[in-house]
């Protein structure tokens, strides 16, 4: 089949998010063709170029979210009036005037997919109606780039904030807040003006797969709206949660309005998608609170390449039995301060213990945090010397992967007997899975998907509790047999659940499920414009009854294509073109 892979700030760019996952997915499903539609986030990302493409990537189309383009569209009076109406309706939903898109609970904004059989309210459809109204206007007029940056858009947003029924944060929005929100909406809605939704674009694929929520899912929603192509949404991090975590210092009005936008877009994507996959149960709970129907949800764990860690995982224990290892990006969310205080307690009971902190800082904030941690380590653990003529040493070391002692990540995990994770905020703990693949016993804080990943193969303590963290580390340092048992169990669990192979197989099954239940009805034409005989198998015209769902799942209706909906004529697809 032919898949339209939708990304934002990710594949195929070298520095993209989830680049490795997308590349492994495309290469692992070599029997399918992929058309990649990528939204870039920065000029730097574009300048770094693309990762080498798999042979089954048919073509790549890109668009920018960081640079304001000019589509040259000039709206007439009637078009401007339509734009003001639809954008004003979208702004009213975000401001909560006369109802708002739910971002909690279980109701979907889609009329087709209401939770627990409940009928969707008219207010719940307002976000989608306004969004598709803008999309149809953009398609007719050739784009909305100028309109979304116009004074009319800001004034429509201001009217919505001042309207009766608007929530408190919206009513308190000032001019800088309105300008910031309008600028963000203009960037996020740029996919409305793209020419990706014709019969030679996303209209020619069998399935759209959005590799994340947010703007990446928007082209999939529009392809479904205009051409009926089914949509699959995959999220390893929920955009609404990311917004809350990354914008703590934004003005309340900006935080509130953008949270409403992310929640509304997420609810619309979940409602219209055939299947929604989450990377873990933690993300799945967020999806449910944003309106996802439980019957559509699947949990597909990220796939990791186990081969680089095989030698360490299968070798006889050769690590320093007194060493604790922490590996990851250095940033405040990792709470290395608590780890250092916990290690001070460990040293009181195990004087030979050492702590290796392996990782590079994440941005300027991470660099400042790393400097603070170095200063704290020097204060807590003054350099110790065995005698008056010996050089002193610190039991805490700060290192990075790639040096002579730790050329690759597997060497870092192999250097310690216990791997520690001390985060206060965590999504899917990649470093923890790598430690499990290396057969290492782990001590982790109970955040994000840690408990789900660890199962019963490691010790879990509350976050921000240095004493509990220290006690767990001491318990494992003193019991090598227990470390060995936990490490073996951890490696077995990781190989069973978190490998590339299981990830690829899961998505292959989901692709087949979606295309079999929601195929795109097309009339294929030959060079003369006549219907091409036998272009579609006879089975596509036969209504069938699907097997009963598994026990405990609600029964689903028959396939949508059996109802005899209108068919859409398309021109034949040309020979595969080179990726550009």
List PLM regions with ranges:
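Aromatic "clamp/platform" in nucleotide-sugar-dependent glycosyltransferases that forms part
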Residues: 424
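Short acidic/histidine- and often glycine-rich active-site loop of Leloir-type glycosyltransferases
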Residues: 447-460
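Short acidic alpha-helix that forms the nucleotide-activated donor recognition element
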Residues: 268-271, 390-416, 437, 467-471
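Nucleotide-activated donor-binding/catalytic signature segment of Leloir-type glycosyltransferases, i.e.
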Residues: 370-404
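Conserved acidic donor-binding segment of nucleotide-sugar-dependent glycosyltransferases
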Residues: 459-466, 475-481
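A short, well-ordered alpha-helix in the C-terminal region of glycosyltransferases
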Residues: 468, 482-497, 503-513, 523-527
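Short hydrophobic beta-strand element within catalytic cores of glycosyltransferases
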Residues: 441-444
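Conserved donor-binding/catalytic core segment of Leloir-type glycosyltransferases
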Residues: 311-347, 354-361
